[in-house]
Structures are given as structure tokens and as C-alpha cells.
Regions:
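Mixed-charge, low-complexity intrinsically disordered regions
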Residues: 1-71, 77-135
Length: 135
């Protein structure tokens, strides 16, 4: 499936969500189930991506074993500070109980592991649409 999608979307990036195999599977499952339509990264991490993600970009989402689970397309990007995250954008990420409090706790832990967390840190928030799901 990954090879098929790489041929169909030759400019697509292949990657997995999160920073662990368990998180990669959990978040990919939320995307496939239609619950996750947004994600964010620290601006520091975003600036290291080559080429950078832009609206219209295609992505092949992988699970923890590197198998392709779906193709998504970036619809919009916005710059937002961690402490300015809205409840609506937090819920769009589809994680936990969908609350802003859950989002703050989970993402603070993630960004602390990354070594970039502060309440004022800048995030790149991405909204995306699912185009195809693996059978």
C-alpha cells in the first residue's frame, strides 16, 4: 500500500505521529476513525522539516511498523502559542476526552520529552483531511 500511494502521491511525505510506537498506532487509529483532523508541532521542530509542510501537502501516515494506514492532505497551517490553544482546536486533535485540559497535559508531556516546552512556546497547528484509508 505504501508503495502504491508513493506512486500515486509522489511528493507525499511518509511519517508517523507521536514519538513512540504506541503513540504512532494510537494517533493513526484516531485519524482512520475520523476523530483526529488536526495536529501540532513545535515551531522549532517544524523549522527542521525538509521540505517544510505547506497547505496542499500530501502525507502518507505510517503505523509503528512502517505500514501505510492512510493518506492525508494539509488544509491549513497556523502559528499559535501553547498557552493560547483553544478548546476547539484541541478537540480537533481527537485525543483523550477532547478537552483543552487533556490536550494541555498530553502535549506538555510530549514537548517536555522533545526538550522544547514552555507556556509561551510557538506551535505550528495543522488541519488536514483524510483522502484514502488502507483496506
Amino acid at each position: 500500500m505504501k508503495l502504491y500511494w508513493q506512486e500515486k502521491y509522489p511528493q507525499a511525505f511518509c511519517w508517523s505521529f507521536g514519538d513512540s510506537p504506541a503513540l504512532a498506532d494510537e494517533l493513526a487509529a484516531l485519524v482512520v476513525a475520523g476523530k483526529k483532523r488536526g495536529t501540532c508541532s513545535s515551531l522549532v521542530s517544524y523549522q527542521k522539516e525538509q521540505p517544510p509542510v505547506t497547505p496542499g501537502s500530501y502525507h502518507i501516515v505510517l503505523n509503528d511498523t512502517g505500514d501505510a494506514v492512510c493518506v492525508i492532505r494539509t488544509l491549513a497551517l497556523r502559528l499559535i502559542r501553547f498557552n493560547e490553544m483553544s478548546a476547539d482546536l484541541a478537540a480537533l486533535e481527537g485525543e483523550g476526552d477532547l478537552s483543552l485540559a487533556y490536550w494541555q497535559a498530553a502535549h506538555r508531556a510530549f514537548f517536555e520529552r522533545e526538550g522544547n516546552w514552555s507556556p509561551e512556546m510557538e506551535l505550528v497547528y495543522e488541519e488536514f483531511a483524510v483522502l484514502e484509508i488502507a483496506p
